[in-house]
Amino acid sequence: MARAASKPKKEISMEEALWKSADKLRGSVEPAEDKHVVLSLFFLKFASDKFEAQRKAISEKYGEKFVDNVAFYTKDNVFFLPEISRWSFIMENAKQDDIALKIDTALYTIEKANPALKGALPDNYYSRLHIDTAKLASLLDEIDKINTGDKENDIIGRVYEYFLSKFALAEGKGKGEFYTPKCIVNLIAEMIEPYDGILYDPCCGSGGMFVQSMKFVEAHHGNKKKVSIYGQEYTNTTYKLCKMNLAIRGISANLGEMAANTFTNDQHKDLKADYIMANPPFNQKEWRGDNELTDDPRWDGYEVPPTSNANYGWILNIVSKLSQNGVAGFLLANGALSDDGTELKIRRQLIENNLVEAIIILPRNLFYTTDISVTLWILNKNKKARVVEENSEVKRFRNREREILFMDLRQMGSPYEKKYIELTEEDRAKVTSVYHAWQQEGYEETYQNVPEFCYSASFDEVAEKGFTLVPSRYIEFVNRDENIDFDTKMKMLQSELRDLLVAEEKSKADLLTVFKELGYEIEL
């Protein structure tokens, strides 16, 4: 009997092969540790390959006697690697029982030899994890196959980006905060256009905002050297991820002296940024003590943000860092659009100060960390009419001081990775073209309000609606089901649920009393 033809094996990409190899670490290390194990090895391989290429070039141009001269490496932004830090040494010892110690030693000596990497690399990390030697050797073999010299295809950047997204996806809801999906970062960059000046991210995670901004500048033939990067990150391991991510791509940045809390230990107190991009933690509770930061200069002119939620703390931190013509694009949970109390007072002041330029509701399931819908806020310190030359292009901005653009992108997006979606290049182009047309002179011909998509609201309209920034309060919806006042509906449900819970507690207390009076006390 003839044998059935075997199915051809599905070819997998280099990234997928690496992911499979990294996946074998499961069981050897905690899930949250995977990314640090793998990405640090990527960095080691990348740094070593660049070093070897530079070493060869020095030898050919100046002779062997200069190959160990550190200055010949640093002048070209290449890290100098002592022999025990080189990838060739690691691979020679990959099957040895003490390979974890050798990797730790390699990373330590690289950081010691290169002040620019201070605080970037793991310290005594691999030895502490007690990773199975065979699994670690297998991972090293896969990483060894990467051709980091393929500049045209940005192999190492591609791999690093792929792994950051996969790790965020794997960690899922409640974790993965170190990573903002690329399509969202691209949207922010395309809207605020960070061509020239200081770019700041107060909660920079693994540095995705910086990486995509530099790609944006490059794609538009701008000069990356005209952009200075400043950032801050609270989590030490993520701070290291960011430093490695930027180093791999040759992006220099000031991330402060250490990983630190942006609110209580601001690493850039006097900074004024031309562009701010951020994805702060959503609805962060107890971010300051009751009597802490009450007279912080970042709140000048505004109410002190409440301790119960950091959303408006992040907003005011961003406002305080904007330069005279600064623009910010950042993400917040939708609740910040309509919060009452202190938040309402701050929001009203922001609107009255002509800082809010655009509010954009994003589709659900864009993020790996939450399934809630999220808002992109655009703040602009100067909404007056002016002429600006950006990247050799003259733009004539009209006065938008008493206007806010509202957009709803919930009908956009394409399926991506399991249950998630992403904004395609076409989606983003549609959004940014509408936004930029609305900003500029001649908008009467190039911009129009579109039901279920966008609406330009006047200050008076916003004031009339109690300074809520919920887009559905302004954008016209053709479908009646879509025209539900979400904010009012949710507050009504909130009130009903509160009444039900109070009634439930009373019923439970009454029931316990009855049983006790019958002599059958119930102890909970």
Predicted regions and their residues:
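Conserved S-adenosyl-L-methionine
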Residues: G174-A278, N283-L293, R298-Y302, A333-N334, ...
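Extended hydrophobic-aromatic, low-complexity segments
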Residues: K285-G289, G329-F330, D339-E343, I359, ...
